[in-house]
Amino acid sequence: MRPIIETHSVTMRINGATLVDGIDLSVGSGEMVAIVGPNGAGKSTLLRLLSGDLQPTQGRIELKQADLRSYSAAQLATHRATLSQHVNVTFPFTVEEIVRMGAGDMAIAAAHPLVESAMDEVAIRPLRSRQLPTLSGGEQQRTHFARVLVQLACGEARHGPGLLLLDEPTSSLDLRHQIELVEIAGRRARNGTAVIAILHDLNLAVRFASRIIVIHRGAIVADGPPAQTITDGLIRKVFEVCADIQYHGDGSPVLLPQAMKSIGPGNLL
């Protein structure tokens, strides 16, 4: 499996606080990786480092065996596509115009089938003439996801399998569209894309990801297949809650959270 993105002892400090602490990871073509962890663990900071939006205080990041810093912004956009957690939605463009932005400088005629395909896959074709600010939060999220899919398709047509980064992509979506989004991401992984998604819903993560990376206090504390990674002890330690863990027929775990019980000021069991 060819590595798409690798980090080597990556650390990020801001104002004396260590947000990411000595991260070593490698994600290859065809992997669907979910990053999970509590709020403030460093997940979004790590994703911004992988996207090139932030530069690490220490360590090195390689995208397709080249230093991430060696890519220009234009080059980077053809090798990785990112759906950020917070996207500016005040500009008065239509859904179709937003999705077409993913094609960059590609001619409109050439981009047209990619735009149509992405809108169909994300089920936003009926919204194509609507201006973005008039949509619900979930509809806006799906529009931006379609834009990112177009960007990814354009880049992979030129350079082969790329990197898809998703920062809490399901946060504004109802259950149906949460499942559809992660299934779409999974299809990209099966076609060779390296997919890394921050997911807060552990059941979504363990059901659809082939690999789980658990971040706690800026460091990786677990990394592996869902059935081996998500354990009762890890849930207690990292998330400070109890959960009954059951298993699907394929061995993937299902988490059934228990009511939280206080064991002292600021502590939960």
UniProtKB/Swiss-Prot annotation:
Record membrane topology: Peripheral membrane protein
Binding site for ATP: 37-44
A GO CC term attached to the entry: plasma membrane
Root EC class: translocase
Domain ABC transporter residue range list: 5-242
GO molecular function, one term: ATP binding
Coiled coil: none
Coarse class of the protein's main subcellular location: membrane
Keyword set, alphabetical order: ATP-binding, Cell inner membrane, Cell membrane, Membrane, Nucleotide-binding, Translocase, Transport
Location(s), subcellular: Cell inner membrane
EC nos: 7.6.2.-
UniProt family annotation: Belongs to the ABC transporter superfamily. Heme (hemin) importer (TC 3.A.1.14.5) family.
Subunit details: The complex is composed of two ATP-binding proteins (HmuV), two transmembrane proteins (HmuU) and a solute-binding protein (HmuT).
Function text: Part of the ABC transporter complex HmuTUV involved in hemin import. Responsible for energy coupling to the transport system.
Protein name: Hemin import ATP-binding protein HmuV
Top-level taxonomy: Bacteria, Pseudomonadati, Pseudomonadota, Alphaproteobacteria, Hyphomicrobiales
